[in-house]
Amino acid sequence: MSLYPSLEDLKVDKVIQAQTAYSANPASQAFVLVDASAALPPDGNLYPKLYPELSQYMGLSLNEAEICESMPMVSGAPAQGQLVARPSSVNYMVAPVTGNDAGIRRAEIKQGIREVILCKDQDGKIGLRLKSIDNGIFVQLVQANSPASLVGLRFGDQVLQINGENCAGWSSDKAHKVLKQAFGEKITMTIRDRPFERTVTMHKDSSGHVGFIFKSGKITSIVKDSSAARNGLLTDHHICEINGQNVIGLKDAQIADILSTAGTVVTITIMPTFIFEHIIKRMAPSIMKSLMDHTIPEV
């Protein structure tokens, strides 16, 4: 089954397929598009879960009942008429409209655990501040153009291991001490990406808009029949990135400027407000506004 970064890409590819099939065998039956409202599969859920399962994060207990109450968009089938998008590898996407867009590559989410290797800069630093929360070590700050920024570490990521040592139960001081004493040429970190993120790729209309309104970084409404609506953007979600560029901690005017200067294809990374606000509450929000990395990552 083909995967697409946006609904526009899917529709154009369907037309291309139909034209190709007709050209190859014009006498054959007409190409029929299957109605998206087809019957649900036996499990009653047309869509897989949008987000990975997670029982604990920064002291937040996320059992099924609490997820249903606080984030109804996460569990079960979507309401009638609600559109859904889910993150997937850009390497396997069919994108006749979007093309090889750099924003999609920068914004790609790799759910699960990953390993990064970084080295210290000329000052012996990696540009990373960690914080101990409920026996876990989390990324509190990534500085611009630092080694930590270059390997893709993000605010809210959990550090599971440093150079093969489990970080569970460490204090913030111990984590920083281990990094300070580590060999500068190679530091290996095992990372669990911040949870419940997803990306949505949209296309600007003739007026340069994708069709959503936000306040304090939170998506508050979706414009009917816009690209945002067609591609499953949801309200009550916070914008974390635009085309892979971190916008957490920026003012609305700054976020609007980034959106307006983006190309015709815009990929945003969002997180349920319930989770986002919990992370911010535990992470000292004043640091975000003054020191956090907001540069455009390289791909």
From Swiss-Prot:
PTM annotation (Phosphoserine): residues: 6
Modified residues (Phosphotyrosine): 47
Post-translational modification: Phosphorylated on tyrosine residues.
Entry GO terms, CC: adherens junction; cytoskeleton; cytosol; endoplasmic reticulum membrane; extracellular exosome; focal adhesion; interleukin-5 receptor complex; melanosome
Pfam families: PDZ (PF00595)
Keywords recorded for this protein, A-Z: Acetylation, Cell junction, Cell membrane, Cytoplasm, Cytoskeleton, Endoplasmic reticulum, Lipid-binding, Membrane, Nucleus, Phosphoprotein, Repeat, Secreted
Positions of region (Interaction with PDCD6IP): 2-103
Subcellular localization: Cell junction, Focal adhesion; Cell junction, Adherens junction; Cell membrane; Endoplasmic reticulum membrane
Positions contributing to a 1,2-diacyl-sn-glycero-3-phospho-(1D-myo-inositol-4,5-bisphosphate) binding: 251-252
Segments carrying motif LYPX(n)L motif 1: 3-7
Quaternary structure and partners: Monomer and homodimer. Interacts with SDC1, SDC2, SDC3, SDC4, NRXN2, EPHA7, EPHB1, NF2 isoform 1, TGFA, IL5RA, NFASC, SDCBP2 and PTPRJ. Interacts with PDCD6IP. Forms a complex with PDCD6IP and SDC2. Interacts (via C-terminus) with TGFBR1. Binds to FZD7; this interaction is increased by inositol trisphosphate (IP3). Interacts with SMO.
Listed name of the protein: Syntenin-1
Taxonomic path: Eukaryota, Metazoa, Chordata, Craniata, Vertebrata
